């Protein structure tokens, strides 16, 4: 072998291998100390890019989970607030139910209305003060609010919370048809009751017979109320236009085909003869008589069949000729505030004919606090005895008074020129259905004694409230009002339940989304760990390998350097 001292090939090889081993040992120590397989781009450039992307995705998903939990917190806050509002509505409906019986006086009903007003104030207070991070939740401004729930932009869930103030909920539709003055067979159809389909009811006969009339029609409508959302009530009443005055019925006087005969009665039916005679056959006629608080004769059909008066009931009863055949008025209620669309055949016999006066109104919960104006009151069926019909056209007041059936014709004791006190006869009278029609009904001409500028005071002042529908007191202070508030409170409850149901659906959607992205986040982190994190078992083996090689490399270099000493032996 050759001996060279200028170039120690063995030492160079040992050094080169030692450098490689030292570098690998450093990498292994770095991995073991950091727990990461990739500590720099040089370790695995593509792996690092993938791992960084996965790390970003996992972090974004973590924030998306937080966003979803914030959204759930917002919706839960609104839901709990509405739960309290629902309890308030339950109390309002309970108080309205308490007021909906004639054992209550105006005083006690007014007390109940005061309670209801306070409850509504608290309901509105909840609606106006419920907030999250300064954001109003129940005021109607929380509309299409977005929550980012994904790793990429525009992966959102939208949430809307409807307004819950008393002015925004409880919107209930009331419709009352015109007074029905003719019998017939009615076929009633609700158009687009569910937004698409029509609902056709069975035909009903409107007459004075048992099992017919508006009572039968209302029963037919109410059988399907759960499906159509429309409920019906009826009022079949014939009321005198003035307090009863002494008079005598004819021998042929009959109601619904049952002859009652001649009855002599006193002012205000003081002897009870007229009421007693009519009620003696009420089980057969279905018509019950009474004298109301104003002293007027009131005939009521409890079961909803018509009231038909034959013969002469006497001028003192003040039953007009056009009221002697009366089949009442039908009232419809719908708990969503939308118009009730009706079609069918012979609708005039149900009060919903093309030429009949139909009162319509949509009323919110807040509106039930205040005074019901005339239009709303009539739509709800207030005082519906003689409304919805015009008495007829006459050239003058005198002409009307002289007409048969007016109660003021010759022989009644109130005829023209008798000098009787007409204002007494017309006190609290209802003459027409709408004040705007006054000029077409009473065309007062010069010379009648009641023309413009007249100073006569025998006739009661012609106020619109005397001749048409009138405003009604607030809320539950009347029986009809209490019934209406019950309907409105029920609608308000349905409205809040719908809003809560929508919120609940969004909460469930958010929860499912959170569950999904939580699993996704775990899987993404697992994938990142597989790429980025070190396998300690494998790396420990590598460390042992390079540690031993480093030690053996040092020994090899030591031996390679010692080989050069052999050259000195040649020189000795």
From Swiss-Prot:
Pfam families: Flagellin_C, Flagellin_IN, Flagellin_N. Keywords: Bacterial flagellum, Secreted. It comes from the Bacteria. Transmembrane segments: none annotated. GO terms for molecular function: structural molecule activity. Its main location: secreted. It is found in: Secreted; Bacterial flagellum. One of its GO terms (cellular component) is bacterial-type flagellum. Disulfide bonds: none annotated. Heteromer of flaA and flaB. Flagellin is the subunit protein which polymerizes to form the filaments of bacterial flagella. Belongs to the bacterial flagellin family. This is Flagellin B. It comes from Campylobacter jejuni subsp. jejuni serotype O:2 (strain ATCC 700819 / NCTC 11168). The lineage of its organism: Bacteria, Pseudomonadati, Campylobacterota, Epsilonproteobacteria, Campylobacterales.
